């Protein structure tokens, strides 16, 4: 952790050329902006977003569950007093690999006007560093099959497509 800025613990700073961003732990006040990021892509547009007060309440309940559990970190990148990126990092204990602790990166989103400026790479690099710091043996992530550009991005950062994932909606 780098330090405090305005009462917020800064986890990392990112030089964006003409400006800078900080990576910090998400706070409840960030939930609407995070949901906007989730809903702003082709997949999230059909499953995320706040249309009613009940929708917002569901996201707030989820935020509180994540925030209360030390095995989960929800972080945001803030630039020019706006939330411009997010990701969730979860730590998963398991018996496989001699009881190795794994890190799972999920819900990576960077606002469109901040893509291509190094912010996504900085977020992932921070997540890898934090995973090492927590004693993880590996970092894993999933990405929808339709996200070919994201796959190339993750491969460029050293991730290897080793598994075929499956989901069952409940």
Question: What does each of the following model-derived ranges do?
Answer:
Residues 22-36:
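A short beta-loop-alpha structural element at the N-terminal edge
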Residues 64-75, 104:
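A short helix-loop-beta-strand connector motif used in the catalytic cores of GNAT acetyltransferases and
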Residues 94-105, 115, 161-162:
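A conserved beta-turn-beta hairpin within the catalytic core of GNAT-like acetyltransferases
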């Amino acid at each position: 952790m780098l330090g405090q800025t305005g009462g917020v613990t800064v986890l990392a700073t990112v030089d964006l050329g003409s400006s800078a961003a900080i990576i910090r732990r998400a706070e409840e006040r960030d939930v609407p902006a995070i949901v906007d990021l989730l809903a702003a892509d082709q997949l999230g547009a059909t499953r995320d977003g706040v249309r009613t007060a009940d929708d917002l309440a569901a996201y707030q309940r989820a935020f509180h569950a994540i925030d209360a559990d030390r095995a989960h970190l929800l972080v945001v990148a803030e630039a020019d007093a706006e939330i411009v990126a997010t990701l969730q990092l979860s730590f998963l204990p398991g018996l496989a690999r001699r009881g190795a602790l794994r890190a799972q990166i999920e819900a990576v989103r960077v606002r469109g006007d901040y893509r291509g400026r190094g912010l996504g790479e900085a977020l992932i690099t921070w997540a890898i560093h934090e995973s090492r710091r927590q004693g993880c043996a590996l970092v894993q992530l999933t990405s929808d099959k339709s996200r070919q550009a994201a796959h190339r991005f993750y491969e460029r950062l050293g991730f290897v497509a080793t598994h075929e994932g499956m989901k069952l909606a409940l």
